Amino acid sequence: VSTSKGIMTDNDARVKNVGGEIICRVFWFIMSKLGKKPIQIPKDTKVKVEGGKLILTGPKGSKELSINDKIFTASISDDNSLILKLIKKNETSKVMWGTTRSVINNAVIGVTVGFEKILEINGVGYRASLKGNVLSLQLGFSHNTLYEIPQEIKLTVEKSTIIKINGIDKTLVGKVATEIKMLKPVEPYKGKGIKERGQYVLRKEGKKK
């Protein structure tokens, strides 16, 4: 094991409660490097900085983010980039720097072009339809399975077997896609169920009689 005290056996490192410092330092370096990287704001999108608050407005909608103004400062540069700077530098704030920068960047992408997940339904008689803000699914059960669509999500159904999930919040789009997939996960033998487009499904051969 590589440690700040040299190379040790795994057992010695456990006894002396050391190890992993090199990996941690590399991680802090990567997150710091990410945090320093400016976020380019597209011409159709506006970002307003108000203390510890960021207000983002773009073609797809608006979003408000809060940042810890005791740790970070945010500003807009002359070339229309958002710069996130650290006030206090320590191991924890360096990790938060990269994470916060990623959250802001995703918000910029979200209000500018949005995020999308596409689900595919496979199975004889399996289909989907929309009834207001409710997704109705026929998935081989004796009753329809209903899923209430969050207000922030735009959901469309194409050809009864394609579900498109759109929104400005990357996390919420992913959450909705996962919840719908879990209503009928793809089984490995015939591939029946709901899967994300491009998702690899490990197929199994059925038992031979």
Regions found by a protein language model. Name each.
Residues 1-209:
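Ribosome-associated RNA-binding proteins
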